[in-house]
Every structure is written in structure tokens, then in C-alpha cells.
Amino acid sequence: MIDILDVKSRATIQDLGRFGLRRFGISHCGAMDKLALRAGNILLGNAENVPAIEVPLGGITLQFQQDMNFCVTGAFYEMMLDDKPVFAYWRYQVRAGQILKMARAKIGMYGYLCVQGGFVLPQALNSCSTDLRAQIGGIEGRCLQAGDQLQTANDHILRSEIGIAPIPLRDVIRALPSSEYQAFKRKSQYYWWRNEWTLQSNSDRMGYRFQGQTLELKQPLEMLSHAIQFGSVQVPPSGQPIILMADAQTTGGYPKIANVIDADLGALAQVRLGSTIKFEAVSLQEAAKLRRKNEIYLDQIRRIVDEKN
């Protein structure tokens, strides 16, 4: 079991999300950086979909009530286990009574505290992920708060402490032109790929809002609501793009200029508020190769874990 002693961020329980329910209007949800969550679970010998604590930017203190292994992946935090500094992408042994403090993220946005065996929580629509709008999943569909107790499915077999290569963060996010790309003026197409974009403070798990050069359509475009997904880049009348994130709604009516490729969704999630990024066009073939590269990275972790366990 783990006791939450203090929380200063909107930390939630997340797994890989809800699959096959978007046609019913159910958001996918799940970890913002799914690659980081998968890496953490594999490092601990867990199934990839085991729920973890997603911590945005930092500000959580917790106490372990039993011996176990844990790791933190995703963002790079200032962390202390009692009075000893600990680091991201390392599997640590912890003893009952020890206290972990994740003070703040130095690099990146979302960290994933994974524990050996994962957390034991009731599922809502086949997932433990917290959906804050629907108020389902996790702990009563809400953010974690001081006093919460999280039951763990610990197998009581402590594994050696090992580290893995971290997932590199990016300030150039790769994307594909979307279905309405040709509806935008040529100069707006140029601006999208060539200019820098700043992530605004009103961004959240539903959507990342960027500020930059105004994107303009060739002519007014009336659209029926249509399916959208994590990574879709919508352009509302303001001309400032919104990239739909893990908690995004299932349909939308704004034209889309691009779609962030699957391989870079985690890197996009780790962009800090106020940071500036650029977008790079890739082909479908390149997108598939980059996705496979992520799977190779996870396969490498599996081999390391098999050798060290």
C-alpha cells in the first residue's frame, strides 16, 4: 500500500486508456505519454497497461507501506527517497516506511510513478484511467489528494536496481498533413511547418493550445462534426491551432491542418507550458518506421529486465 501525504499538482491514476468506446462518445483518456508509462511498467516486470500515478510538473509526497520496487519515467524530476536523491528511468528498491518526494519536474511535463505489480483499483469501462470530466476511473474519478491510500498488487519479490536509457524529449514534433490541409492558404501551410509555436498556459489534458502566426483558410469552410483523435490539429476561427490530447472529445467541427504522428505523441505531451516548438512533415512510411523505433526501444528494455531479474 502507498499513502499519499501531500499533493500540489493534478496527479491522477492513468493506464493506457479506454479502447473501442469512442463511437459511444467516451473519451480514450489514459496516460498523456503512453510510451513512458509502458517503459516504466516493463522496467518493473509489469503488464504494460498496469495503472500508475501520472504527475504533472511535480508536487507529490507519498509513503510506501511495504517493501517493493518502483520507478519514475517521463519527465525528469527532482526526487528524494528519504534523504537520498533518486532519478528517472531507474528501478529502485524501497522499504516499508520510506517517503518519496517528487518536488518538481526539471525537464518535461508528465511523470509516471510505477510500482511493482501496479495499483489495485476498480475498472470503469475496462480501464482504471481517471476521466475528470466524466468523473470515472482512478479514485472516484478525481485527482489524488492527501489522505488517499492506494492498494498495490505487490508480488513481494524485490528485483535488483537497474537503469535504462531515457526517452529523448523533442522540440521538433513530426506530423502528417490532415484531411483539410489543402483548404488552408499556401502561406498558412508554410507558417505551420516553418514557424515556431508557443504552448499556452490554458492547455490541459484535453487540448494543447499554441500561439503563433495566424492560420487562414482559403475561404470559409462549414463542416459537420466528425471523428477526431489524440494528435489531431484543429484550427478554430482564431487561427491559433489546438492539438487534441488524451482527454479530448470524440468529435469536432473545426478544420484540421495536421495530425501529430503516433510516435511523437509522448514527446508532444512532455512540452512545457510556455515552451516553443516546431513541426516537421513526414511521410506515412516514415511515421511507421518511427513507431517501430519506439517498439524496438521497449524491446530493449525487456531484454535488459530479463537479463537482470
From Swiss-Prot:
Any one GO molecular function term: 5-oxoprolinase (ATP-hydrolyzing) activity
Organism superkingdom: Bacteria
Reactions listed under catalytic activity: 5-oxo-L-proline + ATP + 2 H2O = L-glutamate + ADP + phosphate + H(+)
Cystine crosslinks: none
Pfam families assigned to the protein according to its UniProt record, in alphabetical order: CT_A_B
Family: Belongs to the PxpC family.
Protein name: 5-oxoprolinase subunit C
Species: Haemophilus influenzae (strain ATCC 51907 / DSM 11121 / KW20 / Rd)
Taxonomic lineage from the root: Bacteria, Pseudomonadati, Pseudomonadota, Gammaproteobacteria, Pasteurellales
This protein's encoding gene: pxpC
